């Protein structure tokens, strides 16, 4: 139950059942974690077909209920990793409002849709919108491939930082 690294550790959750998520968060309570991260970004078909990860982006009302419960249960930081939408951005503004209503502490935003996977061009304008709209820091994710691209994209979007995915392994 000790964290020997002296570095913050987050537990990432994926799921749609509120009671299961509540039980999991309570199971984490005795451990020295810095916070809970809700994954709303996974684009894997075997995941989103179960209406979890990026699949939940089709249901902003359900996300609101999950985040309300998490905000109530989590005394540490509550963060969210999400994409700009499932097949398009029709719920994007509503999702940003959900982030504000539930007082999320950090939003990591992948600038593509779930169905866009890793093939489509990232929409960095959505990151700019999120930075202006939410009351928490926003990390940009999507095609951050180097220090140079990270710096350029942070300047372009005003994001507070970047989250590096696949390129972290390649580099």
Task: Outline where the language-model segments fall.
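Flavin-dependent oxidoreductase catalytic cores
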Residues: 1-171
